[in-house]
A protein has these predicted regions:
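ATP/nucleoside-binding phosphotransfer catalytic cores, i.e., glycine-rich phosphate-binding loops
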Residues: 150, 166-169, 215-288
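Redox-cofactor binding/interface segments in oxidoreductases and associated redox assembly factors
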Residues: 11, 68, 180
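Short glycine/serine/threonine-rich phosphate/pyrophosphate-binding segments
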Residues: 20, 73-79, 187-192
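Short, well-ordered beta-strand core segments
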Residues: 66, 89, 178-179
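Gly/Ser-rich helix-loop-strand patches that form or flank binding pockets
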Residues: 77, 82-92, 99
Length: 288
């Protein structure tokens, strides 16, 4: 089990949130009594209650469990910290949405006791690996939990994106942009752009055009073992590639974005007696 031999816990705290910072102090004391170390990133969580500092690489290597005190944005940034390791993640909701941070603060210590005892369920979320190429030069790479987005600046004209799956031509999308989303990301930007809600455990990826020029260019659901190539076909100022809405890169005509399923998953502790549709009904206010 992922919880076997937890000796070190990493903490990620929502920036500038005093209540979350105070909870991190309480967590530090709770773990210390049980002989478990707590680490945080330098100049961030490590400034709270003298929590031990750990650089990004050290954080990835040492943490056996990550506790996230924040909202979905904090959780998404945490996904980049797990690297290629199968690290267990416990999300405590201090944000406004909480699709991913499903535990309430009053449930945290009871959840930790269950994790240490090995009594928990894991929700394994698909992640995508992304590469940005210009000719034969790889400009950037990363991993996303929610989505990869190519879109235009406010005043830029419509962009044209060539889409290939496993080197087979699919379509030239003429639109304000294109979203490539995981099932986790299906309730984020893709949903706002008219994409479907996809159950988190489905082996699928969603391609959702943003304000397509042709109304018949609809969202497409594809198997997650497909390799996706996106190529910007026309000149347009201000076209940006965005990873999980948090990291952005400028694109030029001819640039290619390669996307494939990551071999590692993002492993969330699942609350007992609570399911995905409970979350959807609450967050999307179904029936109200």
């Amino acid at each position: 089990m992922l919880s076997d031999g937890i000796k070190c816990v990493g903490v990620v705290v929502k920036p500038n949130h005093e209540e979350a910072r105070q909870t991190a102090c309480e967590l530090s004391e709770w773990l210390e009594k049980r002989g478990i170390a707590l680490i945080g990133k330098p100049h961030e969580e490590a400034e709270i209650c003298e929590i031990e500092e750990a650089g990004t690489e050290e954080f990835k290597e040492k943490a056996d469990l990550i506790v996230v005190l924040g909202g979905d944005g904090t959780m998404i940034s945490t996904a980049r910290l797990t690297g290629s390791r199968e690290i267990l993640v416990l999300g405590i909701n201090y944000g406004s949405l909480g699709y991913l941070t499903e535990f309430r603060i009053e449930e945290m210590f009871a959840a930790l006791e269950e994790i240490l005892a090995g009594n928990y369920e894991t929700d394994r979320r698909v992640m995508l690996e992304v590469e940005h190429w210009r000719g034969n030069e790889k400009l950037a790479s990363g991993r996303v939990l929610n989505d990869v987005v190519i879109n235009k600046a406010v005043l830029a004209r419509i962009i044209e994106i060539k889409v290939e799956l496993n080197n087979q031509f699919v379509n030239d999308f003429r639109a304000d942009g294109l979203i490539v989303a995981t099932p986790t990301g299906s309730t984020a930007y893709s949903l706002s752009a008219g994409g479907p809600i996809v159950y988190p455990s489905m082996n699928a990826i969603i391609l959702t055009p943003i304000c397509p020029f042709t109304l018949t260019n609809r969202p497409i659901v594809i198997p997650d073992n497909a390799e996706i190539n996106l190529r910007l076909k026309n000149e347009s100022d201000g076209v940006v590639l965005t990873l999980d809405g948090q990291i952005g890169y400028q694109m030029q005509v001819g640039d290619c974005v390669r996307i494939r399923k990551s071999p590692t998953t993002f492993n969330l502790v699942q609350p007992p007696n609570r399911n995905y549709f409970d979350v959807l009904r609450n967050k999307l206010k179904w029936g109200r």
